[in-house]
């Protein structure tokens, strides 16, 4: 393949030319003689670089080919397996998690654990550093799982006071039928709205001379008995 020819302006330059001239800014004056000298130096340097580039291309083309470390089939098979298992755009639903000990993708410059706080990344290749960092990180995780965790009291010598026991719930035993309105039979309880004891009756007390019944307390307050069944009403 023939290389493209480099454009070279022919000497002498047209009188009155005021365009860019290489190396002219390094000269003290901008006369026509200095302009011709600058163009001549530029043409020689350009031709020399062009010859060196062609010589390099020839040496690369004639160099002996190196033997591959792995066959092309092995490389393609490995890439296909990696693509099938770990590619993020795969549409299959897999529960396979990428292991930590696998080296990252070439060119990946993400976070590596234990890379900046240890000497594992000194004077090694990136893949070797990544493998060592992940291995050390996994070892730390395994040791942390197997270590015996001491309680807080043993480490700092603090005696923890047990929480107070929960009091048992109060069970109120009532005999007979219970009304559906709030329970006013708790002694000593007060109503937050009326600001008086719940057992206190604002009406004047009614007393009678009849003999005491179970529904009448010794304090003289009269309480109605619950209604009995239909048989009692008929009788």
Swiss-Prot record:
Tissue: Expressed in sperm.
Entries under Pfam families matching the protein: SPMIP5
Primary localization: cytoplasm
Entry's transmembrane regions: none
Cellular component GO terms held in the UniProt record: cytoplasm; cytoskeleton; motile cilium; nucleus
Keywords: Cell projection, Cilium, Cytoplasm, Cytoskeleton, Flagellum, Nucleus
Entry-linked InterPro entries: SPMIP5 (IPR043246), SPMIP5_dom (IPR055215)
Subunit description: Microtubule inner protein component of sperm flagellar doublet microtubules.
Function, as annotated: Microtubule inner protein (MIP) part of the dynein-decorated doublet microtubules (DMTs) in flagellum axoneme. May serve to reinforce and thus stabilize the microtubule structure in the sperm flagella.
Name of this protein: Sperm-associated microtubule inner protein 5
Source organism (scientific name): Bos taurus
Lineage of producing organism: Eukaryota, Metazoa, Chordata, Craniata, Vertebrata
